[in-house]
């Protein structure tokens, strides 16, 4: 029994380990990976490995894994990556797993500066990445510093601007807030729709020379072959769509492209190494096949996948709508609960006030009762005093009578009696005056007593009214809410050729009519322009890269990816090949 070989495959978001047999082919391993991750759009992907010379190479599916120059490690290391890119992500990427893998791979390429991205666009893309990771912005959860541990912008962008982490976060957060209600998978798609308009997106660059020996770049992508000057990977100078090419071949380091136009000469260039020509051939065949497939009606399998994806998306939208509805109900119930609590507090406060008023009224009643008793006692004292004075007056009257009688009897002592009489008369007058005053005082105390009695009765009535008033109603109860392979050929083969068929193709150069995503959205376009102006104020001009300068020139000239594409394909094939030879 042959000993199994351990293999580790790293996807963009997972690490898979398998044990394979010595006779396992590249396709068998590839099939095992896509089955494990649940991927059906297999034509975009491949398995990448580092060979014994340190070069990054794609695993050939039609050969045994052990017959290929994989660096000897235990386990054998492979990366599962997108090898071919779609023309339009929103039309071609069907499954959510495919969208996520592309999103993660493109995001990594932008952050590593393998794809040049201008600063303002990098901020917009970062906000979509944040929405995809965190969902809707919530100031209660996403406190200042919530993005501190996230790698969201290329290091080049951070180093070129005199902005703090907090200032970058603020700019990303502003756009994050605008994405409210956007599903996480839709955020990934919006990211890719913006990213696919970047000039270096989906391009495989190869160093080549023309017959003159001029060093140039060959760009192979989903739309065709483009030629770049050696110091400018952003703006291609000549372009050949796949629909103009009928045959591609190489012999050692010489690569020959035969156009469909029989009048046009062969398009010839030279690569520094044979292995590069093998890679170019494999990428040309794969991209051409996908280019043709897109321009033909969908296969039954693709139609089924699209229908299933639509159904899954519809189901997610329904679930989201239901969650939003439940969330709103919960918020309404919370607000209602808060309102009831508030009203309850208000009623308790009112009840407290009534109790305080009652206690105050009771105290006033007690005070008035005390005063009434005091007044009554004063009245009694005044009455008793008046009675005493009356007795004294009578006694004086009697004494007066006795003295008068005595005066009559004793004429002898008339002077003495007259003096006594005068004295008693004066005393009587004083007593009369005192009696009168005491009677007035008694009357006054009588009035005060009546007034106090009336106040007492009135207070008793008020207290009776307060005590008999119905208690405040209890708060109502809170009701909870219801809640594809292309063999790069054997390493020993120094030549190879492939015919590229263009039969049955509809509207084969539709890509030339495209506009960028920001051109479609005026609001985003203006926001990007405003942010670009704002960032220019904080930019350190001494740290500008060659790509920054080239990008600024393109913006100034009004060029974008698709305008450039139309321009570099102008004229017939012969004219463009002649132009290439003259470079």
Curated annotation (Swiss-Prot):
Residues 5-295 form the FERM domain. It is found in: Cell membrane; Cytoplasm, Cytoskeleton; Cleavage furrow; Cell projection, Microvillus. It holds the Pfam family FERM_N. It is a peripheral membrane protein. InterPro entries: Band_41_domain, ERM, ERM_C_dom, ERM_FERM_C, ERM_helical, Ez/rad/moesin-like, FERM/acyl-CoA-bd_prot_sf, FERM_2. It is linked to Deafness, autosomal recessive, 24: A form of non-syndromic sensorineural hearing loss. Sensorineural deafness results from damage to the neural receptors of the inner ear, the nerve pathways to the brain, or the area of the brain that receives sound information. Binds NHERF1. Interacts with NHERF1, NHERF2, LAYN, MME/NEP and ICAM2. Interacts with CPNE1 (via VWFA domain) and CPNE4 (via VWFA domain). Interacts (via FERM domain) with SPN/CD43 cytoplasmic tail. Interacts with CD44. Interacts with CLIC5; may work together in a complex which also includes EZR and MYO6 to stabilize linkages between the plasma membrane and subjacent actin cytoskeleton at the base of stereocilia. This is Radixin.
């Amino acid at each position: 029994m042959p000993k199994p070989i351990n293999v580790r495959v790293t996807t963009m978001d997972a690490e898979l380990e398998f044990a394979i047999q010595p006779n396992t082919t590249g396709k068998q391993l590839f099939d095992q990976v896509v089955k494990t991750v649940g991927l059906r759009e297999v034509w975009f992907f491949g398995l990448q490995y580092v060979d014994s010379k340190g070069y990054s190479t794609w695993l050939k599916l039609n050969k045994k894994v052990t017959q290929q120059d994989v660096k000897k490690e235990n386990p054998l290391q492979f990366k599962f990556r997108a090898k071919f890119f779609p023309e339009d992500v929103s039309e071609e990427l069907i499954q959510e797993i495919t969208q996520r893998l592309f999103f993660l791979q493109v995001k990594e390429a932008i952050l590593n500066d393998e794809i040049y991205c201008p600063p303002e666009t990098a901020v917009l893309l970062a906000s979509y990445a944040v929405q995809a990771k965190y969902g809707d912005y919530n100031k209660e959860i996403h406190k200042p510093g919530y993005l501190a541990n996230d790698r969201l912008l290329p290091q080049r962008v951070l180093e070129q601007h005199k902005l703090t982490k907090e200032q970058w976060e603020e700019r990303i957060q502003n756009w994050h807030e605008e994405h409210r209600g956007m599903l996480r998978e839709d955020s990934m798609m919006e990211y890719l729709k913006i990213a696919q308009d970047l000039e270096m997106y989906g391009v495989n660059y190869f160093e080549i020379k023309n017959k003159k020996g001029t060093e140039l770049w060959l760009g192979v992508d989903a739309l065709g072959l483009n030629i770049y000057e050696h110091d400018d990977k952003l703006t291609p100078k000549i372009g050949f769509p796949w629909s103009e090419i009928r045959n591609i071949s190489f012999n050692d380091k010489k690569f020959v492209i035969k156009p469909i136009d029989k009048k046009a000469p062969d398009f010839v260039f030279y690569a520094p190494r044979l292995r590069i020509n093998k890679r170019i051939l494999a990428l040309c065949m794969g991209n051409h096949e996908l280019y043709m497939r897109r321009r033909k009606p969908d296969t039954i399998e693709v139609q089924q996948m699209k229908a299933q994806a639509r159904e899954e998306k519809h189901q997610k939208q329904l679930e989201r709508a239901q969650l939003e509805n439940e969330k709103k109900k919960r918020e309404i119930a919370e607000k209602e609960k808060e309102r009831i609590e508030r009203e309850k507090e208000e009623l308790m406060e009112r009840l407290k006030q009534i109790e305080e008023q009652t206690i105050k009224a009771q105290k006033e009643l007690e005070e008035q009762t005390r005063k009434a008793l005091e007044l009554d006692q004063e009245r009694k004292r005044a009455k008793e005093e008046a009675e005493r004075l009356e007795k004294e007056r009578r006694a004086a009257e009697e004494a007066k009578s006795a003295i008068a009688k005595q005066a009559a009897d004793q004429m002898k002592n008339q002077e003495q009696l007259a003096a006594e009489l005068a004295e008693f008369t004066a005393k009587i007058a004083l007593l009369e005056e005192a009696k009168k005053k005491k009677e007035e005082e008694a009357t006054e105390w009588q009035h005060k007593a009546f007034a106090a009695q009336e106040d007492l009765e009135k207070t008793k009535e008020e207290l009776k009214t307060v005590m008999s008033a119905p208690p405040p109603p209890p708060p109502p109860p809170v009701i909870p809410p219801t809640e594809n392979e292309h063999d790069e050929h054997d390493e020993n083969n120094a030549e190879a050729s492939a015919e590229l068929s263009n039969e049955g193709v509809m509207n084969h150069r539709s890509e030339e009519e495209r506009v960028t995503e920001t051109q479609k959205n005026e609001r985003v376009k203006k926001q990007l322009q405003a942010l670009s102006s704002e960032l220019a104020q904080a930019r350190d001009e001494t740290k500008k890269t060659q790509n920054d300068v080239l990008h600024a020139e393109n913006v100034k000239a009004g060029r974008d990816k698709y305008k450039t594409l139309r321009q570099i394909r102008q004229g017939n094939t012969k004219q463009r090949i002649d132009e290439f030879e003259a470079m």
